[in-house]
From Swiss-Prot:
Quaternary data: A double ring-shaped homohexamer of HslV is capped on each side by a ring-shaped HslU homohexamer. The assembly of the HslU/HslV complex is dependent on binding of ATP.
Residues the record marks as active site: T6
Protein name: ATP-dependent protease subunit HslV
Catalytic function, reaction form: ATP-dependent cleavage of peptide bonds with broad specificity
Organism: Maridesulfovibrio salexigens (strain ATCC 14822 / DSM 2638 / NCIMB 8403 / VKM B-1763) (Desulfovibrio salexigens)
A GO cellular component annotation in the UniProt record: HslUV protease complex
Main EC class the enzyme belongs to: hydrolase
Gene Ontology MF annotations: metal ion binding; threonine-type endopeptidase activity
Family: Belongs to the peptidase T1B family. HslV subfamily.
Domain of life: Bacteria
Length: 179
């Protein structure tokens, strides 16, 4: 049985980037297996933040591969993401992985999917996972209508998402990078 269910949100402003994830791991459609999973972490000497949604074991495989790409390309986030997406799309083993990752540095937020997509949002806000739509909507509203810093927008948006999405809890891990 697959273990999944999460929300990851990244928000970028003129001072830096924040990424936040909830801690809930759900088995199937009915059982919460863990409340305090850590799905957001720093990579490459704390210069990159990465978060995942989907199958946990698959996500760890993707994190390891992405960190190798960062080392190969001297921390160049965009190049590493493009190379990772190419491998993911063309490798028989990787294509079967059921996870999605979001990576960010102080300048970029990128969503990397198994279809070979590398997507950078136009507005500096991106979200993945079951509660992603709720968190994204809240973050965009706060970005447009307040002067809150990125970390505060991320926190408040995840609080809203956790009130709506049954697969998202309020045990958050928040990581930030300054420009």
């Amino acid at each position: 049985m697959e273990m999944r269910g999460t929300t990851i949100l990244a928000v970028k402003d003129d001072k830096g980037t924040a990424m936040i994830g909830d801690g809930q791991v759900t088995m199937g459609q009915a059982v919460v297996m863990k409340h305090s999973a850590v799905k957001v972490r720093t990579l490459y000497n704390d210069q990159v933040i990465a978060g995942f949604a989907g199958a946990t074991a698959d996500a760890f495989t993707l994190f390891e591969r992405f960190e190798k790409k960062l080392k190969t390309y001297s921390g160049n986030l965009v190049r590493s993401a493009v190379e990772m997406a190419t491998d993911w799309r063309t490798d028989k083993f990787l294509r079967k992985l059921e996870a999605m990752i979001m990576v960010a540095d102080a300048e970029h937020i990128l969503i990397i999917s198994g279809n070979g997509d590398v997507i950078e949002p136009d507005d500096g806000v991106a979200a993945i996972g079951s509660g992603g739509s709720y968190a994204l909507s809240a973050a965009r509203a706060l970005m447009r209508n307040t002067d809150m810093p990125a970390a505060d927008i991320a926190q408040k948006s995840m609080e809203i998402a956790s009130e709506i999405c049954v697969y998202t809890n309020d045990h958050f891990v928040l990581k930030t990078l300054e420009k």
